[in-house]
Amino acid sequence: MKNKLKHLVPVLLALATITGSLSACELKPKAQQKVSKQGFYFDTIIQITLYGTTDEKYIDDCFDMAKKYEDMLSNTVSYSEVSKINDAAGKEYVTVSDDTLELIKKGIEYGDTSDGRFDITIGKLSDLWNFSEIAENTDSKDNEVDASVVPSDAQIQSELSHVNYRNIQINGNDVMLTDSKAKLDLGGIAKGFIADKMKAYLQSKKIISGIINLGGNVLTVGEKSDGSDYTVGIQKPFDESGEPICTVKVKDKSVVTSGIYERYYRVDGKLYHHILDTTTGYPVKNNLYSVTIISDSSCDGDALSTTCFALGIDKAKELINSLSGVEAIFVTDDYSIITTSDEYNVSTE
């Protein structure tokens, strides 16, 4: 438990950064109503804050949604629909709910958009590297581990050969993996998908102002009570002080970051991180520490942040410029900040 808490520290600090930024930049009427709660889902701490109400029911309903979708979409929950698809790989179709089908179709769409750099059949390769468990169980401050934890090239190439989202077959609500050794993993887009569903629910209940934070997936509902933008902090990689490397100003937008500091370990000082290159099977090698995507949809932000990290700055910029309503912020390994536009007032002050 001690080691897991160590890796939750950046999440807690990120929550504090967002809340602090919002509080510091907003002059609120004394009578303004607000309710905020935290919960633990998806192996991380989530926080939902609503303005204009003190009714916790809306947040509790969102937490119920988190539990429902975790039980439906997680490949670590044995009875989930995704686990059933994996268990039946190469054998038979599995009938799934409309929500699971929607997310799988989105995953396939992102696979096409990224030319396979984002692939929801990466499950076995991710399991092989085992970043979450290894990083959580090390007592080293720098996540230094024994060289024996690094998989062999033969193992990596073997699992990589089963990473191909085109092996997903869909017939109505029936889904099958045609490769018996493939494994579906929706973790790269599930939190964004769930955040979008929560926002839609809140809007249906006439909630017009709030923040949904699912462990780094920040989705704002509407704008602040005075009509101004929210200020959201972008985490400084490998920093546990809580100070953001920069902030952005947004309203009714999603802010999602993928970074190598989220799950990693080191062997003899060499860093291995969880963002895997689907062309090599190894952690992506480039000069990036993190990529943040600002978009309308948190699900889009999830997929695009991973994709853009894998592509590298130049190709990622080309992709972002081809999309409508999407911008990116890149943090390089020398802590330089590169943006695709100045629309969201990126500030380091």
Task: Describe the role of every protein-language-model region.
Residues K2-E349:
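Mature catalytic core of soluble alpha/beta enzymes
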